[in-house]
Amino acid sequence: MTKNIHKHRILILDFGSQYTQLVARRVREIGVYCELWAWDVTEDQIREFNPSGIILSGGPESTTEHDSPRAPDYVFTAGVPVLGVCYGMQTMAMQLGGKVEGSNQREFGYAQVEIKTDSALIRDIKDAINPAGEAVLDVWMSHGDKVTAIPSDFVTVASTDTCPFAIMANEEKRFYGVQFHPEVTHTKQGQRLLERFVLDICACEALWTPATIIEDAIVRLREQIGEDHVILGLSGGVDSSVTAMLLHRAIGKRLTCVFVDNGLLRLNEADQVLEMFGDKFGLNIVHVAAEDRFLAALAGVDEPEAKRKIIGRVFVELFDEEACKQEQVKWLAQGTIYPDVIESAASATGKAHVIKSHHNVGGLPKEMKLGLVEPLKELFKDEVRKIGLELGLPYDMLYRHPFPGPGLGVRVLGEVKKEYCDLLRRADAIFIEELHKADLYNKVSQAFTVFLPVRSVGVMGDGRKYDWVVSLRAVETIDFMTAHWAHLPYDFLGRVSNRIINEVNGISRVVYDISGKPPATIEWE
């Protein structure tokens, strides 16, 4: 009998911080299940979730404003430990009788926190000892407001030169507030602090591991599906690949994978997917060669969002056609992951703006009479990759750079043509090959080539040529929300440029994109 890996769970209430998902990922890394909910959750919902502890996230609002978000009152009467982070500490302090004020001295970045009082939260956790003999923590601050008076039943645990209450605690109730961000790597002991809260103070057992997640998923899939058949759109990307492997382990040949070759994939990608999943792992795969259909639908279209929607629509049409041929199929599997669920919830409540539409989220027709199977919907991307390794998928496939759902359809600027895609595929393959050879591939977060629909004069031998331009793009980022262009060596860029121009007939010029995000996005379209 498998252990209940959801037995011990942490509830994280989201007040809008850019780091909130990182808090959840850190808790999962500790080995404990957690969920991320909006701050205005009801008492009944919290009772039903039955958390072992609650974390209040940071956020951009000011608790000094009358309409700023507040934690539900039940959070402080539920009888479980509570950790407030940054804004979470401020709202905890204010709601329990303390004071918060705006400050002329804002703290953004590195700070040293001096420990004044012993606390279960940080006992024996320190980075150094200062001349006064106090333990010191190196932390990351990001706040304007600050607590100026703590609730009467709290004590001051730590402070900085400009923040008198950097950590506060009520040990009896197991309520703690930290003005810094323990979830970011700049807070050196942040993970130890979170481990102390989750494992010791909340008394959670670390049951959330790749092996137990797989075991639990297989049991639940078999219970949900029974003896029925399942269909899955297999793209060769991380999410659909891990979904396929989980389902294959759970139900074997009752899974049918539909692989749509849209003509917008990377060089030799279709052959690689079919060889790996069909020949090596023995999955049942239906190969749909649909390059002509996609390119016909994209003819004459140059607006990026229109291209995305067309690619999504044609994929759904093809998938629907194949699903109708599979008379035994009762379930549709999707590689939805936890950030998709969070994003969809935010969109449903009007708290998010669509910057680029996702071609594979919520796109399948409502009239399809199939049940939905989403075995990854509780997992973050890093967890999906770890599970993939456990299931036997190769590291290089799981950890390769992100590739957009519409594929080369949004890396060929303007109208998409077969000629452009063929040239781009070959140029991009050279760039990626050289990154691997120079041991640079894993030192950048994402790298790819973009086809520009403009011609440029070049000289080859004694003749002139008038051919196409491509741009190389490489970025470094932690979360893909912001990114810096990668400072690749000039000799490396020169080598890539020479190879592309000499080996790809039809390209006469190679440029390098040095735009950051913001103001640019990582992808060009």
From Swiss-Prot:
GO terms for cellular component: cytosol. It catalyses: XMP + L-glutamine + ATP + H2O = GMP + L-glutamate + AMP + diphosphate + 2 H(+). Residues 208-400 form the GMPS ATP-PPase domain. The keyword Transcription regulation does not apply. Pathway: Purine metabolism; GMP biosynthesis; GMP from XMP (L-Gln route): step 1/1. Gene3D superfamilies: 3.30.300.10, 3.40.50.880, HUPs. Pfam families: GATase (PF00117), GMP_synt_C (PF00958), NAD_synthase (PF02540). The active site is at C86, H181, E183. Transmembrane segments: none annotated. The keyword Nucleotide-binding applies. Catalyzes the synthesis of GMP from XMP. This is GMP synthase [glutamine-hydrolyzing]. The lineage of its organism: Bacteria, Pseudomonadati, Pseudomonadota, Gammaproteobacteria, Enterobacterales.
